[in-house]
Amino acid sequence: MGTNNDYRLKPSFGDSFGTGWRVMGDNFLRLFLVVLVVGILTGPTKMFHMNFSSSDFPHFPWIWHGHMGHEFFNLASLGLLAGFFILLALLYSFLVVPVIKYGSKMIFIQAVRKIKPDFEWLLKGFWENYLNIILANLLVVALVILGFIALIIPGIIIGCRLAFVSYLVMDKKLDPIEAVEQSWKLTRGHGWTIFFMGFVSIFIVIFGLILMIVGVFPATMWISSSFASLYQAVLNEKEKPAELIAAQA
């Protein structure tokens, strides 16, 4: 972490996106590969958004043509099939995807710290810190949903204040409760910065999609690098060495 000063790490909107751009440029191929792999590994959850009808499976054994009440049995069979796929999607979304996404965030932190990104982080969470990752993700999702139910704005506030949970779980090996509490402390005074960065990120992704879709890869890389830069900048601010604090006094 002694090379952090190579980048302009200040917890502001402009500095975070500016540093994120530099980080992306310095590690383009490696971060591109990370984003590509994450997209492939998290993509299966989108495969389960299907619309079934009995006409799609005319020769399957559960199609009860010619039997009394065959329409009911057809619908029931398709319902069970759809339920099975939905269950698979939920299990994959909550037991696999968070590990991959949390690992990718650690890779972006390494890039910000000028450490050679280690691709093993994409899967390392399955044998290291797995339970903390899964529980932290569930806790954050539950808190944000409760906030949105409470009138939307609380959900946005909670989402912004818990933006560092995934970084803290991977970087500091904190448990879910500690990560939530620490993220809340670290983001104090930076909530608006996180909100505006998230808001602008939406338009960056849209612009990337407009560029023949392929632009979404550098857009995602830039956004991820920028948030990792913000996290590191806030961390540096909160963890200043004692001698530096004494010198500034």
Could you say what each language-model-derived stretch is?
Residues M1-A249:
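Hydrophobic alpha-helical membrane segments
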